[in-house]
A protein has these predicted regions:
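Short, charged recognition helix plus adjacent turn
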Residues: 78-107
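Short basic helix-loop element that most often maps to the first helix and adjoining turn
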Residues: 22-38, 99-106
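Short, basic-rich loop-to-helix N-cap that marks the start of a DNA-contacting helix
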Residues: 56-69
């Protein structure tokens, strides 16, 4: 689906984008970096950093990870998304995960 025909992001997603953007900005400032310096370290443009800090959701996941790496916070991201680091994931740790999930019939 192209960006031009995507549905608007739900409010919780927009809030999370702004929160992540604010966190990136705070980390950048804590590291004493300008937007340009961070962009150079991450191999992106300064405008990409500006967009990320403003909560622009069109930035690719790889770019987010490169910026997190440049800020020294990359290690925390995979852990934050690890299902076994959550209560639900731990509860289901004994369940066998299927190799493939098939759509359920609605009939």
């Amino acid at each position: 689906m192209s960006a031009s025909n995507q549905q608007p992001s739900p409010l919780p997603v927009r809030r999370a984008l702004r929160e992540v953007g604010g966190s990136l900005q705070t980390w950048r400032k804590l590291r004493g970096l300008t937007q340009g310096q961070l962009a150079d370290r991450a191999g992106v443009t300064r405008m990409t950093i500006v967009r990320m800090e403003q909560g622009d959701g069109t930035v690719r996941t790889e770019i987010l990870l490169r910026v997190a790496h440049a800020l020294g916070v990359l290690d925390g991201l995979p852990r934050a998304l690890d299902p076994y680091e959550s209560d639900l994931g731990r509860l289901r740790a004994d369940d066998r995960l299927p190799k493939r999930v098939r759509p359920r019939s609605l009939t």
